[in-house]
Amino acid sequence: MAECGASGSGSSGDSLDKSITLPPDEIFRNLENAKRFAIDIGGSLTKLAYYSTVQHKVAKVRSFDHSGKDTERDHEPPYEISVQEEITARLHFVKFENTYIEACLDFIKDHLVNTETKVIQATGGGAYKFKDLIEEKLRLKVDKEDVMTCLIKGCNFVLKNIPHEAFVYQKDSDPEFRFQTNHPHIFPYLLVNIGSGVSIVKVETEDRFEWVGGSSIGGGTFWGLGALLTKTKKFDELLHLASRGQHSNVDMLVRDVYGGAHQTLGLSGNLIASSFGKSATADQEFSKEDMAKSLLHMISNDIGQLACLHARLHSLDRVYFGGFFIRGHPVTMRTITYSINFFSKGEVQALFLRHEGYLGAIGAFLKGAEQDNPNQYSWGENYAGSSGLMSTSPELGPAQRARSGTFDLLEMDRLERPLVNLPLLLDPPSYVPDTVDLTDDALARKYWLTCFEEALDGVVKRAVASQPDSVDAAERAEKFRQKYWNKLQTLRQQPFAYGTLTVRSLLDTREHCLNEFNFPDPYSKVKQRENGVALRCFPGVVRSLDTLGWEERQLALVKGLLAGNVFDWGAKAVSDVLESDPYFGFEEAKRKLQERPWLVDSYSEWLQRLKGPPHKCALIFADNSGIDIILGVFPFVRELLLRGTEVILACNSGPALNDVTHGESLIVAERIAGMDPVVHSALREERLLLVQTGSSSPCLDLSRLDKGLAALVRERGADLVVIEGMGRAVHTNYHAALCCESLKLAVIKNAWLAERLGGRLFSVIFKYEVPAE
């Protein structure tokens, strides 16, 4: 987020000057490559949306061409790495106060060079008011779009594409935001938009919705009556007054009417019997704060009851609230949530959206881009370029609040392939990828934020070392450090800024920030070297395994999987060893492992299962490059193939830490096939299939996987899922329930986490699960 000089002391003119002189890459990023625009102008805020292309570096691997050569390949790297420029699509959303609209349009005009469009889609009440100004400044024709259609299109888009977009507000919780996991079936729902008035819309599908009701008593009523009662003209100042008021001084409560007899009615004595009821009889002056609070309760309760009645009428249990009246204000969300809970007896859920302020702009953009069919793609929030859900609490006072004089930002990257649920999830709506919610667990939150802060020096050092020929690598690495450090400080103050805070979101944010400053794969050369070493060891490891008896071999294969998983550059306990001892290898890793019984030990049950019929098809999610994939995973895969089980080996689509990528796995498999007839024939006969997950994360979200992978899982009838590594099997998916057998295994390489789980460093998780009949 770029501050616009808003300390509360300067004039709006000073703020404006400072905001517009900020570098364009801080606010209107990639503006020079903007292709299409949309704008949503409300009563006080403007939301600009634009689609641009982003050029960034990606690391690609390619097998060496050995044709016609008779050379000694033992000490040659297994593949070559090249860094290429890639162009991807990104959606940018910028939110700012209407005060700045003319200066912002001038700024856009000055930096606009590559736009392909002659039209800008516009929605919101201000679209008509500012039409001439926009056309004059940008020389683009304004096409006005229907407000409600845009809101609904925007709402559908964020619910589908942004995990943890929706949240419930719980007044007495810490923090007060409870984020919902992505529901695979978002329809039907009720959208209640509270602007000047209230509109209530039933949304049934992507394109089918109907206006079912509304009210003239909305945000405009609160503003208008509030101004008359308190002489306060500014909406946010009214909310600030309300946050400090005590409504019971003005409202008549049930206990004021019935005394102690209210209990026979089954009502709480604190319920409002009559809004402003005391003002007619009490001979006293009421404070502005109390009147504002009473007014807020009156209007929120009215809206809540109306929404609840419509939800029940249409048999809906999810109601999303948005509009100028909400805007993430705790005092407003609190009263609406209370009202919905009371009138529905807890059967209807009041939900709010992290990005509700952008819905109109997103919808207007989607309307203008229909010929490009943006809904055929999946999109992901780019944490590096988004300012997150900032505190808007009126309790802070208007002068201190981050909203005043700021530009809020949201960026969405278009993903290469559509993402869908893993078909083997037992109950997709209840699936939660993350094991620990750090917004809930203050002790864990403090530990992990400190852990990521302390690791920053090492990440910066690794990033610089990965680009020895770059003259500006150190400068870019410092920019990365500052950006990620700032994100961590934001999350210390506001753990809910980007939805549910988890170890996964901290890792993903770091990867986004590294990509932002053109460090696409800091571990590429480390992986190349370790893959080369491990490939040379592969024949010996397989020969050794083949000499063992069946039962002894099964344990050796599992220990090999676990030992391979030790080689994780993302774990400080391991990276310290690998950097200080270049001879630390596969056998040394085996000796590090906890002796049986392991911390979680289902090995006996797994061995018993192996004595039964072979699985039809195993889906394996691999973790690290090098020893892990080559000496741990591939021998395990080979054994499954020998049993008659088909194998789908799923690896990351893009790089993260030293995790193996799909591109690397193809080359590794090709090299192993050249040494091993079992793997060779399985690849040729398509009994071994290598696929990409659609992810570039060290963790695993089974609700956002490559559509092609999901189709293959269905087609091959996968009946075993193997998830390997701390990020995929412990930080995520430890509690994931599947409708087939599963194996989750990892070595705990973090002493704090191991102790929390009741173990020690290098404790072993081996969790074999069979679904209930």
Curated annotation (Swiss-Prot):
The cross-references to InterPro entries, in alphabetical order and at most eight, read: ARMT-1-like_metal-bd_sf, ARMT1-like_metal-bd, At2g17340_3_helix_bundle, ATPase_NBD, PanK_long, Type_II_PanK
Ubl conjugation is among the record's keywords? no
Give the span(s) annotated as 4'-phosphopantetheine phosphatase.
403-773
Q: Which GO terms describe its cellular component?
A: cytosol; nucleus
Task: Give residue numbers for the modification (N-acetylalanine).
Answer: 2
Q: Name one GO biological process term.
A: coenzyme A biosynthetic process
Reaction catalysed by this chain?
Answer: (R)-4'-phosphopantetheine + H2O = (R)-pantetheine + phosphate; (R)-4'-phosphopantetheine sulfonate + H2O = (R)-pantetheine sulfonate + phosphate; (R)-4'-phospho-S-sulfopantetheine + H2O = (R)-S-sulfopantetheine + phosphate
Q: Where is this region: Pantothenate kinase?
A: 2-402
Assembly, in brief, is:
Homodimer. Interacts with PKM.
Q: What does this protein do?
A: Phosphatase which shows a preference for 4'-phosphopantetheine and its oxidatively damaged forms (sulfonate or S-sulfonate), providing strong indirect evidence that the phosphatase activity pre-empts damage in the coenzyme A (CoA) pathway. Hydrolyzing excess 4'-phosphopantetheine could constitute a directed overflow mechanism to prevent its oxidation to the S-sulfonate, sulfonate, or other forms. Hydrolyzing 4'-phosphopantetheine sulfonate or S-sulfonate would forestall their conversion to inactive forms of CoA and acyl carrier protein.
- Of which family is this protein a member? In the N-terminal section; belongs to the type II pantothenate kinase family.
Protein name, UniProt field: 4'-phosphopantetheine phosphatase
Task: Specify the species.
Answer: Macaca fascicularis (Crab-eating macaque)
Q: Which gene encodes it?
A: PANK4
